[in-house]
Amino acid sequence: MANGWTGNILRVNLTTGNITLEDSSKFKSFVGGMGFGYKIMYDEVPPGTKPFDEANKLVFATGPLTGSGAPCSSRVNITSLSTFTKGNLVVDAHMGGFFAAQMKFAGYDVIIIEGKAKSPVWLKIKDDKVSLEKADFLWGKGTRATTEEICRLTSPETCVAAIGQAGENLVPLSGMLNSRNHSGGAGTGAIMGSKNLKAIAVEGTKGVNIADRQEMKRLNDYMMTELIGANNNHVVPSTPQSWAEYSDPKSRWTARKGLFWGAAEGGPIETGEIPPGNQNTVGFRTYKSVFDLGPAAEKYTVKMSGCHSCPIRCMTQMNIPRVKEFGVPSTGGNTCVANFVHTTIFPNGPKDFEDKDDGRVIGNLVGLNLFDDYGLWCNYGQLHRDFTYCYSKGVFKRVLPAEEYAEIRWDQLEAGDVNFIKDFYYRLAHRVGELSHLADGSYAIAERWNLGEEYWGYAKNKLWSPFGYPVHHANEASAQVGSIVNCMFNRDCMTHTHINFIGSGLPLKLQREVAKELFGSEDAYDETKNYTPINDAKIKYAKWSLLRVCLHNAVTLCNWVWPMTVSPLKSRNYRGDLALEAKFFKAITGEEMTQEKLDLAAERIFTLHRAYTVKLMQTKDMRNEHDLICSWVFDKDPQIPVFTEGTDKMDRDDMHASLTMFYKEMGWDPQLGCPTRETLQRLGLEDIAADLAAHNLLPA
C-alpha cells in the first residue's frame, strides 16, 4: 500500500506501555477511517464492554485520501463506545483541523489506544519515534494550555489533540480539541480521560505518496473551478449578483459587495462578488460569523480559516478585545452550532453591551472559548436545549438540592449576563453539584430526573431517538429521507449528503431534474414542508445519502462539502460529478476505481456498523428496539394533516412502510431490519455472518 495509505497501524497499550506496529492492509476492503474503526472495534471490543472499561478502545483512523492534498480531506474518524446514549453502542466522532494530515505525514493510517495508564500520560509521535510521556504537569489544564505546553516541548509544527477538565472528570458530553478549535466530540474526551491519556501530539515529515501527480493536479483544478461551491456546497449566492442566475437568502455563499472582514489585519477586506472559476477566491465565499451570528459579527471578524487542504474556510476567526473581561482570550472562532449555541440558554436573550445584537456575538465568543478549553461537547446543541427545557419546566427547582439551587445566579440567566455561562460551564466541566449531570446526556438525565414522555415528546427539544440523541437534518430534510438517515446510527447521524443537496440554493425544478437523474424519478425530491408519501425513489435517495457519508468518513473527505452533487456553473447546467471521489481515489492510489465500486465498499462499511450494533444490543429486532423515533415527529402541527403543505411531521404508517422498503433495499430482513447471511456474504463479510450466526443473531 505504497500510494495513499501508509500501511501502518500504531497500537498503543497504555496498561503495559507497549507500542507496536501492525499492517493496515489486512483491512483494505474497509477502505480506511470509519471502515477501519468498525472492523477493529468489532473484532476486539465484545458486547458487555462499558465505555470506561480498560477493554474499550479508541480508534483514530484516516483514509487513502487523507493528507493527499485533495480538497477537504483532513478528517480523522474516531471510533469508540458511546458515553452518552442508551446501551453505550458504537459511535464515531469526526475531527477536522490538522491532526489527520499529520497522522498520515508521520506514517500512520490508524492509531489504536487501548488499556489504561497508571498515571496521566501524553502520546508523543514524531514520525517513527513514538513514546508515552508523563502528563501530571498537564492534568487539570485546559486544551489550549495543554497544546501550548506540548508545543514548547516539541515543535510549533506539532499538532496536539488534547482533552480539557471535562474529559479528565469523565464528563460524558466531552470531546478533544486540536489546532485550537477543531473538535472530535461524541464523548471521546471522557474515553481519553478514563485511560489517563491527556493528549496525542503528532508531527510528521513524510508526506503522502501520490500515484499520478499530474492527474491529481488536474482533478484539483477541475473541482476548484467547475464544481465546488461554498460551505455545505451551496452553489448560488445568498444575494442577487451580476454573475448569478439564481440566489437564495439561506445559502452559505454569503460573499457580496459591501460585506467585509471588518477586523482583518491591515484593515477591512471586502468579500465582494465571487463568481466561480477563480480558485484563489473560493475562500471568500463562506462567511460563517455573519451567517451564524448576524451582522453584528462583521466588525469583529478577522478572517475565515479551516482545516488542512480545505479551500472553503468555514471556521470563523474573531477578535473582540472586551471578552478578556471574562477571563478568556480575545480571539477565537468555530463553525456551525459551536458558534451560536452558547447564548441560546438565555430566556430573554443575551444582554447587549454597546451595539445592537453585540451581546450575542460577545457572549458566544466567551462561551465557545470556555467550552472548547474545558473540552465540553454540546451534542449538536442538545445540551443547551436540555438546559432550557429543565429551566423552563421547573425541573431544576425540583431536582437540585435547595442549597445548590439557591447559590446559582438565576438572575444572571434572566438578565442575559455572560457571567452565567462562565459559572454554568465550570460546573459542567468540574462535575459540581446535581446540575452538572446535565452533561451526562439526555438519556441519563431522563432516567435520573424522571422526565418522562413530556420530555421526549416535546418538539422544541428536538430529541430524535429515545436512545438520547437529537435530530440532525431529519424530517425537515426531505421527510422520509432524513428520517431514515436519522434512525440508522447510534448518535445524531452527522450526515450532510442530503441536506447539502436540499440547501444548494437551486430552484425546485432543477433539483427535481437532478433527483430524477440520480434516483430514477423526480418524486424522490419534495418541496420542503410539502411532502408526499414514500416511494421507491426516496428509498434510493436515502440509501445514497447514507452510503456517501460512510464513504467520506472512510476515504476521508468532509461530508459538509462533499459530494459534488451539483455545480455553480450554468455552463454545466448546474450538474455536479458524483464520480469525483473515485477519480481522486485512482489518481492517489493508482488503483482502478469507479463510483459503483466505492459505493459497494461504503455499503460493506454501513452493513458492518449495523451488524456490530446488532451484536452489541444482542437483538435481531432492530426495527422495534433501535430504529425508534420520538412521538413529537408524528404529533406536531396537530391542526395540519400529514402530507399537506405547511408541515414536516411524519405519518406512523408511512414511516413503518419506509423502513420496510429501506431494509429491503439494503438486503436486510424486511421485518427485523438486521443484515441477512446472504447480504453479509455478498459484501465479503463471511466472518461477520459466521459470528452472528454463532450468537443466534441472524434472521431465519
From Swiss-Prot:
Pfam families: AFOR_C (PF01314), AFOR_N (PF02730). One of its GO terms (molecular function) is iron-sulfur cluster binding. The keyword Transferase does not apply. The keyword Oxidoreductase applies. Its EC number is 1.-.-.-. Keywords: 4Fe-4S, Iron, Iron-sulfur, Metal-binding, Oxidoreductase. Its cofactor is [4Fe-4S] cluster; Mo-molybdopterin; tungstopterin. SMART domains: AFOR_N. [4Fe-4S] cluster binds at residues 307, 310, 314, 558. Belongs to the AOR/FOR family. PANTHER family: ALDEHYDE FERREDOXIN OXIDOREDUCTASE (PTHR30038), TUNGSTEN-CONTAINING ALDEHYDE FERREDOXIN OXIDOREDUCTASE (PTHR30038:SF0). This is Uncharacterized oxidoreductase YdhV. It comes from Escherichia coli (strain K12). The lineage of its organism: Bacteria, Pseudomonadati, Pseudomonadota, Gammaproteobacteria, Enterobacterales.
